[in-house]
Amino acid sequence: MHEIVNDVFYNLAKQYDPNSEEHLVGEVDYHLLCDDQPYEGLPSHRDALRFVFDELVKKSIEDQETARISWGDTFADQLSPLVYDLDQAQASPLDLQVFFYCPNIVKTDYYGNVWYDAEWKPNDDNCGTTVPYWYALMEPVHGRNNKPEDFKKVNEVLFPNGTDQLDIYEWTTDWSDYFDAGHEWYGACCWSVYDRSMKRYVVMLVSATD
């Protein structure tokens, strides 16, 4: 398993968040991977997640050492390297139409608040849980709100051969402190997608709070 270094999708993502080192659109952090090994369904998805989180652990350690150099031991020691236990992660297959569903905007008020014709709405009952893909992309905590056209454009570039040959899994998010921020309020999500037509994986992570 290895990261895809160059892809047209990265250029698109940079238009949405030019200052980020990650490939972010809204609150969705995208990781594109490919593998020399044959695709074996769910075990391959788990391998893709393991690769992504190994890289995130390395980055968290690097960030801690950078903080040590810049701000000293006291500050750096308050930072903890990322921890995860993928053996605790549970996966459920997702229907394509459910995953890629995108509502229409029915109203936008003076302050920029948006109303959709979707059945799902953020409330106290679903606070800190998994949010729909469309919501994570279109309703970030800070910064610009994206529109249904953006949702469509992002996925057309990400999956240029269409969605018919995609295998999608939704994962629980109680197996890594990466998701702690999202559990506080906005939401935490982990999805893995395998595109049979392109023989590549897309791991999508969401974890945000105010």
Task: Give a label for each model feature.
Residues 1-162:
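Extended, low-hydrophobicity segments enriched in charged/polar residues
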Residues 144, 148-210:
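Acidic, proline/glycine-rich low-complexity IDRs
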